[in-house]
């Protein structure tokens, strides 16, 4: 149902909301202070990350994208992403940078990790796509200096999500109209 809501947005609405959210994210203090920021390439009606990526580049931030780990199933690597990066389609039909070990940045060296989500609630819980990739990535985020933040449309807010023991709540979510912090 939430995916249908975001898919129902017109291209013009998507573009406008992507710009609004990017502007809001660029004023979020952890992003302002960051040197390295991991983000994702949006698909399936997700909040458009292209305006954010372009603003991050203009601000001199190093941008990283998630890549499915080739040897450790269910885990992510983060590779440097720049305008000349070669993208390939992964097994989930999502574009990611072509794997080059020289471009990998350890999670502990990421300042901010911007996460996709299907839905979030007023308590910071996020509902992902079901693969558990970000739950595994975020399970020990407090031990790193990495600051996670969700990135979503306003229409992805729900009253309360069911919580499983492996679910990792987010300390913040940025939408086109608001920064939610817990």
From Swiss-Prot:
Residues 11-21 have a biased composition (Polar residues). The keyword Secreted does not apply. Keywords: ATP-binding, Ligase, Nucleotide-binding. Its EC number is 6.3.3.2. It is an enzyme of class 6 (ligase). InterPro entries: FTHF_cligase, FTHF_cligase-like_sf, NagB/RpiA_transferase-like. GO terms for cellular component: cytoplasm. This is 5-formyltetrahydrofolate cyclo-ligase. The lineage of its organism: Bacteria, Pseudomonadati, Pseudomonadota, Gammaproteobacteria, Enterobacterales. The gene is ygfA.
């Amino acid at each position: 149902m939430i995916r249908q809501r975001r898919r129902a947005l017109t291209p013009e609405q998507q573009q406008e909301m992507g710009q609004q959210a990017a502007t809001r994210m660029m004023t979020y203090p952890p992003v302002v202070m960051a040197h390295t920021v991991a983000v994702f390439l949006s698909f399936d009606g997700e909040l458009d990350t292209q305006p954010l990526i372009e603003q991050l580049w203009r601000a001199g931030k190093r941008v990283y994208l998630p890549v499915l780990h080739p040897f450790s199933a269910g885990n992510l690597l983060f590779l440097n992403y720049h305008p000349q990066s070669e993208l390939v389609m992964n097994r989930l039909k999502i574009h990611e940078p072509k794997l080059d070990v020289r471009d990998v940045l350890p999670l502990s060296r990421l300042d901010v990790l911007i996460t996709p989500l299907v839905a979030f609630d007023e308590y910071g819980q996020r509902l992902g796509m079901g693969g558990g990739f970000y739950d595994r990535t975020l399970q020990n985020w407090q031990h790193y200096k990495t600051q996670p933040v969700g990135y979503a449309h306003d229409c992805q807010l729900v009253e309360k999500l069911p919580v499983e023991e492996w679910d990792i709540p987010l300390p913040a979510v940025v939408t086109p109209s608001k920064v939610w912090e817990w």
